[in-house]
From Swiss-Prot:
Reported cofactor(s): pyridoxal 5'-phosphate
PANTHER family: L-SERYL-TRNA(SEC) SELENIUM TRANSFERASE (PTHR32328:SF0)
Record protein name field: L-seryl-tRNA(Sec) selenium transferase
Reactions listed under catalytic activity: L-seryl-tRNA(Sec) + selenophosphate + H(+) = L-selenocysteinyl-tRNA(Sec) + phosphate
GN (gene name): selA
Keyword Cytoplasm belongs to the record: yes
The enzyme's E.C. designation: 2.9.1.1
Compartment(s): Cytoplasm
An individual GO BP term: conversion of seryl-tRNAsec to selenocys-tRNAsec
Amino acid sequence: MNLFRQIPKVDKIEKALTHIPKKVLTPIIQKTLNEIREGIKNGKITQINEEDIVKTIEKRSEEILSPSIVNVINATGITVHTNLGRSLIDPEIFDYAKKRSTHYCNLEYDLEKGKRGDRYHHSAKILSHLFGSESALIVNNNAAAVFLILNTFAKDKEAIVSRGELVEIGGSFRVPEVMKASGAKLVEVGTTNKTKIQDYEDAITEDTAMLMKVHKSNYSIEGFSAEASLEEIIELAHKKNVLDYYDLGSAYIPKLPYSLTNYEPPISEIMKLNPSLVSFSGDKLFGSVQAGIILGKKDLIDKLKKNQILRMFRVDKITLSLIEATALAYIKEEYDKIPTLKSIFQTTEALKEKAKKLLSLTPGLKAEIKESHTYVGGGTMPNRKIPTVVVEIKGNAKKWEEDMRKHLVIGRIENEKFVLDMRSVQEDEIEKLAQIINSIITCEVKDA
């Protein structure tokens, strides 16, 4: 029997799958049939089933056509969850950017002079006012900000950093590697657990361009430890006529609840110290879109803008509009338009109400409402727990975790129980979450 002759014709398969666009279907048919021919040649395929071939091609096509990025319900309790997209954008703020994205806008056009303008002028104006800096610049993320600053001011020169701040954050982003790639010469001072201001001063040479301080994202050093304060570093930098730069990583504006402000000061306190340059992420505690926000002296920001590398880190009108709208919300103290802040500021009483609502909609669920702890996330406030409320589900924790994940609900296992943390569950997601739970319970009853 000639298996090659049993392979269905391309046009026959196309007729069976007319609901799939040809631009997707045709190459998948060709690839699948080529795999079958190869399988026949090497003896791995000994029979042909036309129906199975069509189903395989249909499945592969649907995988291409199905959206890869989908909405999930974040029930982990982590507000700034990097793997789940970090900060949410308020619908009103999104509409602000949408209007400027679906129409032409004055992105790089000076309406007064009638000629080409500066795309960074928009953000510099509002961010400088918000943060109290001389100027500001936005790039596509904080890693880009770090690279741009080092490349502009410390290329082929020395940048002094504490050994305790040579961190690695998510995605294998290592400060020493970024410094090397930027052309800056890393000078390590102090030890992992202790670095004094004298260590910085002793390391300064005629080749020193910068004293750099790095936020220790995702970890903290406690016990027998000490570090030079930002104020000390700024004072020393001014004294020695070199730059000071703080890679803050994340920044917030209003004072945070649960004593979080005691561990890290708000950006307003940092800017009062008059630093040369500061940078942080736009999608962490600031609560906006992914971006690297650079604040500092106007002459330094102007030099950054002249670096040709900035072109590679340039942000578009959507990012600029979202940052601008978020900044406006802060200026007007409309904190309810910052979902990240809303999540962090929720009281345990409010979280309990959400948990009660969920249980009222899931009468068949065996669960308890319990108090627990969670973290802000996104490398901010490492090891600083905040109170939360969870719905602790009885039963096989691993099975519940898998079943919920199949329905795009991401929770966590705590004390060998699957829990849904109400701090990160949105109010308008409660009913949908209840429907998912009820459908899982119904399936379990049918399978029993």
